């Protein structure tokens, strides 16, 4: 632990944390207010937009970071930008526009357009309400949780694909969708995942797309003729020398996904405040998008 602390560039780390405050309260988006609105309303039928997307997304970031209700978000606008913008959006407008935003968490990665990347897949649970344990004990209400499925670039710890589902959805069923989304903007050449993703279907998908599998197979797995050959090879290699297999696929880097979950929960909390499922998903996308902006300081 002491060695790890000594390796951290504390000056750089501190500056990156300071930068978070600049990102959250960056009202410079106001400078492009009219040009952005002109672009958004060009060719639009019906009612016109009165507030640019970049401004609404900034309010969304402030909400999830500071845990602000919509009315307080309106108050922040009045206090910090009231004399700089033509009109103040009321809390219902902020609510509607934030939950209708197209939130993108993955653009072309900065390392280089042609770089190959390895991703780590995993999921975690997020509470659907922060009501306290006493309610569950007194009223016997099962709070439930969402499942957040992610694909993380192990090189920079950024989320490049995210899906939100109910708790009943099995991790393994999300592999294809996560990688399809990740591959839209990245050259995915390897995928690391635990035994929850172990299936012939997933191995066939990875093989078809020329993605090196780094999936931990079940301990009782057998090599069978009808199985996917890529999975059979992984089973044999893991049963012959598990340590060598882990080294060959960089399996130890799978913990990057767990690090991301830890950072998100520590930064934004372990719950969502929205009540509707689609709004819960939007809230998590906002958190993931903001996490990516913060990632260098995590």
Feature locations, PLM:
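Acidic/polar active-site rim loop that often engages polyanionic ligands
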Residues: 78-79
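Basic, amphipathic alpha-helical segments enriched in Lys/Arg and hydrophobic/aromatic residues
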Residues: 53, 61, 242-298
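Helix-centered, glycine/charged polyanion-binding patches within enzymatic domains
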Residues: 1-4, 195-266
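Double-stranded DNA-binding cores of transcription factors and transposases
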Residues: 1-11, 15-16, 54
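Basic, short loop/linker segments at the boundary and entry of helix-turn-helix/winged-helix-like folds
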Residues: 14-66
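Basic DNA-binding region of bZIP-type proteins
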Residues: 9, 41, 241
């Amino acid at each position: 632990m002491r060695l790890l602390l000594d390796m951290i560039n504390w000056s750089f780390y501190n500056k990156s944390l300071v930068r978070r405050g600049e990102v959250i309260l960056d009202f410079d988006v106001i400078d492009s207010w009219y040009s952005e609105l002109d672009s958004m309303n060009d060719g639009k039928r019906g009612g016109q937009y009165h507030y640019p997307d970049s401004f609404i997304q900034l309010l969304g970031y402030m909400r999830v970071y500071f845990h602000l209700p919509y009315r307080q978000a309106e108050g922040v606008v009045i206090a910090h930008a009231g004399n700089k913008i033509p009109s103040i959006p009321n809390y219902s407008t902020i609510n509607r526009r934030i939950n209708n935003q197209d939130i993108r968490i993955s653009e072309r990665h900065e390392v280089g357009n042609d770089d190959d990347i390895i991703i780590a897949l995993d999921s975690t649970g997020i509470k659907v309400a922060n009501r306290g344990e006493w309610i569950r004990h007194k009223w016997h209400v099962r709070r439930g949780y969402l499942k957040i499925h992610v694909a993380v670039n192990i090189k920079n710890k950024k989320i490049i694909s995210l899906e939100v589902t109910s708790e009943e959805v099995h991790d393994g069923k999300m592999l294809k969708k996560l990688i399809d989304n990740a591959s839209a903007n990245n050259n995915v050449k390897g995928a690391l995942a635990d035994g929850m993703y172990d299936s012939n279907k997933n191995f066939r998908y990875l093989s078809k797309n020329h993605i090196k599998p780094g999936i931990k197979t079940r301990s009782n797995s057998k090599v069978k003729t009808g199985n996917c050959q890529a999975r059979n090879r992984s089973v044999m290699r893991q049963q012959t020398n598990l340590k060598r297999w882990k080294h060959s696929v960089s399996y130890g880097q799978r913990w990057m996904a767990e690090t991301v979950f830890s950072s998100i929960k520590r930064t934004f909390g372990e719950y969502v405040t929205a009540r509707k499922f689609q709004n819960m998903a939007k809230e998590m996308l906002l958190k993931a998008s903001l996490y990516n902006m913060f990632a260098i300081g995590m």
